[in-house]
């Protein structure tokens, strides 16, 4: 299982939100590039970056901060937040992003996502952000009428690298990962699934790995790393077991 430490960008700073609420942002580092380097030193092999302002505005906003991250580290980066055009995808891949995450556009224009996956094989992920059983859009400010499985099945055989499923009710709350919800999606599709939201302790990683059924491909670690409820070394050992 691959672990993805998360850097969420708001106004150029590294923050964590509670349940995706932009008004409940805690600044953990004013230098995202410095934070990225720390995660590399901790031994992580990937980095998960989200442009929070971009997710709400529908276009990349924290461009300078992302570029500084890309310049400061050599491990691969997956980036999401406000990327809703093929031109936007291309620009970030040319800038050095290894995997682009598409969320809102996956709901509104699935054909664009499929075309992106054809143009950039294994470099497109789909964000499946779930609240009250439905997929959220526009930086989690709106709800679609699609379930996680409904959305994900649109992209079977499309060449999408991963599905990133986030339980919004648990995001930033350190309440434990929704193993059942993650597992249900993983068993329903053939696309690798990455769990996000609520991973609070090494035990959550162990629970994801121990479940019966399709293997969970990865997990995103956010507040747990910043708050110290998970030690990177212990998390990486658990993920590799």
UniProtKB/Swiss-Prot annotation:
Superkingdom per UniProt: Bacteria
Reactions accelerated catalytically: 1-(5-phospho-beta-D-ribosyl)-5-[(5-phospho-beta-D-ribosylamino)methylideneamino]imidazole-4-carboxamide = 5-[(5-phospho-1-deoxy-D-ribulos-1-ylimino)methylamino]-1-(5-phospho-beta-D-ribosyl)imidazole-4-carboxamide
Keyword Cytoplasm: yes
GO MF annotation list: 1-(5-phosphoribosyl)-5-[(5-phosphoribosylamino)methylideneamino]imidazole-4-carboxamide isomerase activity
EC numbers for this chain: 5.3.1.16
InterPro entries (UniProt xref): Aldolase_TIM, His_biosynth, HisA_bact_arch, Isoase_HisA-like, Isoase_HisA-like_bact, RibuloseP-bd_barrel
Family annotation (Gene3D superfamilies): Aldolase class I
Keywords of the record: Amino-acid biosynthesis, Cytoplasm, Histidine biosynthesis, Isomerase
UniProt pathway: Amino-acid biosynthesis; L-histidine biosynthesis; L-histidine from 5-phospho-alpha-D-ribose 1-diphosphate: step 4/9
Catalytic residues as annotated in Swiss-Prot or TrEMBL: 8, 129
GO cellular component: cytoplasm
CDD domains xrefs: HisA
Any matching Pfam family: His_biosynth
Subcellular localization, as worded in the UniProt entry: Cytoplasm
Gene Ontology biological process terms from the UniProt entry: L-histidine biosynthetic process; L-tryptophan biosynthetic process
Family: Belongs to the HisA/HisF family.
UniProt xrefs under NCBIfam families: 1-(5-phosphoribosyl)-5-[(5-phosphoribosylamino)methylideneamino]imidazole-4-carboxamide isomerase (TIGR00007)
Descriptive protein name: 1-(5-phosphoribosyl)-5-[(5-phosphoribosylamino)methylideneamino] imidazole-4-carboxamide isomerase
Name of encoding gene: hisA
